[in-house]
From Swiss-Prot:
Keyword Membrane: no
Cell compartments where the protein resides: Cytoplasm
Amino-acid positions noted as binding S-adenosyl-L-methionine in the UniProt annotation, renumbered to this chain: N18, L20, G45, E66, D91, N113
Protein name per UniProt: Ribosomal RNA small subunit methyltransferase A
Gene3D superfamilies named in the record: Ribosomal RNA adenine dimethylase-like, domain 2, Vaccinia Virus protein VP39
Organism placement in taxonomy: Bacteria, Pseudomonadati, Pseudomonadota, Gammaproteobacteria, Enterobacterales
Protein role: Specifically dimethylates two adjacent adenosines (A1518 and A1519) in the loop of a conserved hairpin near the 3'-end of 16S rRNA in the 30S particle. May play a critical role in biogenesis of 30S subunits.
Organism: Cronobacter sakazakii (strain ATCC BAA-894)
Length: 273
């Protein structure tokens, strides 16, 4: 028996497909999402409709984004969901969620069992549209959820942690074992809720600087900040910001990264490095 086949569909490795089939887990996720009629609900990667059906039952209209042409076609002809669905057969990484929010006339509520092979880049894509998003609920690798919620001084803390927490309140919801899927993935999974901040707790003047700083610092996470960011910060400047130059990237809080980005915005280096 081929354990990659579920409901007559062969799971495609290149799309990172693992289909949710545990009813308790499905009910728990739908309860956490709590979809209501009139809301702009958007599902990424509906697959074989494990979440689409119970969410769609509560709604008059549901927008879905599905890259797999065969699965998009199945949804189009779904016996009771079909008429409710607006289907975008495309890669979610190419979706303009700001434009979609304008079209739907309100902030989006985004959810999905995300393909694990694109979950991190998709998170960064969605962060650029947080002003158009009310909240997000995603099934992800447990390791990715751990990184999203991690605080300083932990191995899981990294660039994803800083950027996610800059944009959103991050709330773990549920842990999910591999047996809840067909085919079962080789890793544990978890559901997370991301609620964009109405106002960032630590506003930055230029987001590109926060992105650049976190990239440079965490690309050399074993180095001290004095060394990894020495091209833009002198030890004296770091000390004046209340940051020990001997600290490493994983020791610096979200607030401190934002403080550093704002210093750079006000005091740009004479030459871009």
């Amino acid at each position: 028996m081929n354990n990659r086949v579920h409901q007559g569909h062969l799971a495609r490795k290149r799309f990172g497909q693992n289909f949710l089939n545990d009813q308790f887990v499905i009910d728990s996720i739908v309860s956490a999402i709590n979809p209501q009629k009139g809301q702009a609900m958007v599902e990424i990667g509906p697959g074989l409709a494990a979440l689409t059906e119970p969410v769609g039952e509560r709604l008059d209209q549901l927008t879905v984004i599905e890259l797999d042409r065969d699965l998009a076609a199945r949804l189009q002809t779904h016996p009771f969901l079909g008429p409710k669905l607006t289907i975008y057969q495309q890669d979610a990484m190419t979706m303009d969620f700001g434009e979609l929010s304008q079209k739907m006339g309100q902030p989006l509520r985004v959810f999905g069992n995300l393909p694990y092979n694109i979950s991190t880049p998709l998170m960064f894509h969605l962060f650029s549209y947080t002003d158009a998003i009310a909240d997000m609920h995603f099934m992800l690798q447990k390791e990715v959820v751990n990184r999203l919620v991690a605080g300083p001084n932990s191995k899981a803390y990294g660039r994803l942690s800083v950027m996610a927490q800059y944009f959103c309140q991050v709330i773990p919801v549920l842990e999910v074992p591999p047996t809840a899927f067909t085919p079962p993935p080789k890793v544990d999974s978890a559901v997370v809720r991301l609620v964009p901040h109405a106002t960032p707790p630590h506003p930055v003047k230029e987001l590109r600087l926060l992105s650049r700083l976190t990239t440079e610092a965490f690309n050399q996470r074993r180095k001290t900040i004095r060394n990894s960011l020495g091209n833009v910060f002198s030890p004296e400047v770091l000390t004046s910001l209340g940051i020990d130059p001997a600290m490493r990237a994983e020791n610096i809080s979200v607030a401190q990264y934002c403080q550093m980005a704002n210093y750079l915005a006000d005091n740009p280096p004479s030459k871009e490095s």
